[in-house]
């Protein structure tokens, strides 16, 4: 098989697209571990967003620069069956748990 310029350009373009897709869709939030401070989300910062204020907060790099990397907080809260999320200071707060989480899986 001859390596024509069209084949090489198509291959390089494909590699660039795959790398950029993977790079743009990574998350940096990790699940809270026993070493990280975890608190219950009952503070006044969340009261205007939730009536129940049932949830957890944990420190994560996803909320160090709010607006840029909040996708990690969103993904973690969604996969943990919380309805809402919010970055409060440097913490990701997930709250208002889905009552029928067992039915979602």
Curated annotation (Swiss-Prot):
In the record, biological process GO terms are: defense response to fungus; killing of cells of another organism
Give the signal sequence positions.
1-24
Q: Which family does it belong to?
A: Belongs to the DEFL family.
- What's a single GO CC term here? extracellular region
UniProt keyword list: Antimicrobial, Disulfide bond, Fungicide, Plant defense, Secreted, Signal
Disulphide connectivity of cysteines = 57-94, 63-87, 73-92, 77-93
Q: Which organism is it from?
A: Arabidopsis thaliana
Give its localization.
Secreted
Q: What is the protein name stated in its UniProt record? A: Defensin-like protein 106
